[in-house]
Amino acid sequence: MQLLDGGWVYSPTDLVARMDCDHRTALDLALKAGLLPVEPGEADGMHVLAGKHGGAHERRVLELLRARHETVVEIDQPANSRAALRAAAAQTAEALAAGVDVVFQATFFDEHFRGHADFVIRGADGYEVYDTKLARSAKPGALLQLAAYSEQLERLGYPLPRQLHVWLGNDEIVSRSVDDVLPVLHRVRADLLTQLANGPVIPPRIWGDRRSACGSCHWSEVCGQGRDDDRDLSLVAGMRGDQSARLREAGLVTIEQLGAAPDSARPDTMGVATFERLRAQARLQVTQDATRTSADPVGKVTSEYFSSDGVRLLPRSSVGDVWFDMEGDPFAEGGAGLEYLFGYVTIDQDGEDNPLFTPIWAHSPQAEKAAFEQFVDAMEARLAHWPDMHIYHYANYERTALTRL
């Protein structure tokens, strides 16, 4: 959002932010209005790298389109003023009216909305909008932005595009029906406009509940610190959002309150076993937190068995066991990605006190294939020697990546 000449102007990015998290929008508004005493965090290295590779992908597609089409018009990025935005939007409208094949960085501005579409390309059915993304699939946010641009084309008098197109890093073009996305766009836009009309306010609680969008949000550090400072229930390992909401309604708002809660504090909407498990987890974490020091930031970790079923599922240890981790660069090879490290730890050489780490590096698709083959061969050899061995890994990334390879 921007305040231009006293009025709010929103962008497709703001629509995506509102779709992901209304709290983010509230903080953004308060910040722009100068109401907040805190600032959002700086972009981390991954976001900077993503922007760099995304820009390179966009320029590569531009050169590809210039080679394919006779008329490609590039609209310069306008300054942040209504006059400059009007001028850039007029240039875009003139290019479209002239029937050019491609408009790069097409500017749309209707005094309330501003946007810069990567590519507007003329096809058999008229103009349609394309967005370049290094992702391996068309994400909801990209489709929402494309739908907003498509409605801007309709506002200028052109037929509403029937398709939305995402140009992926591997040059695959994923297309989706605009009709599938417009209802979401209309709902999100109505919510955002209502929020803008109500004006900026400082939320009663600076931090927001944890959600999937936190990983890519510039407010994540502020919210995370707020949850830590207030000892929020989201700190309890394994706590779902709906569970914390039920506990808050019952008057339990901190991890300490939950850990010390009597049986009578259980919400009627929560099962006994679930309440007892979450309460025990909170109690263990409170105990650990009390033992943390500057010399020992982890503190004393304790455990409590609620059920041995999960423990029984763990296999017996084997001297041939392997602890495996992979590292990948999702932006390498034009967005196709590259698994550049296959690393594993074994203990059969010198025992558990002296584990051996074996790295297999790959810096090209050919080397990635060779590294994959080397790792699989090594595991098959170990399995032949230790039939009771297992490979341990964290989360599902390794299984998914190996299956893909």
PLM feature spans:
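Conserved DEDDh/DEDDy metal-dependent 3′-5′ exonuclease domain
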Residues: 81, 93-95, 99-125, 129-197, ...
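Compact, charge-rich alpha-helical regulatory domains located at protein termini
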Residues: 227-295
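A contiguous, basic/glycine-rich beta-loop/short-helix subdomain that forms a polymer-engagement track
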Residues: 279-321, 326-327
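Generic beta-strand/beta-sheet core signal
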Residues: 167, 250, 261, 324-327, ...
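Long, highly charged, low-complexity intrinsically disordered interaction regions
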Residues: 179-246
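Metal-dependent nuclease catalytic cores that hydrolyze phosphodiester bonds in DNA/RNA
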Residues: 1-124
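Metal-dependent catalytic core segments for phosphate chemistry
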Residues: 316-374
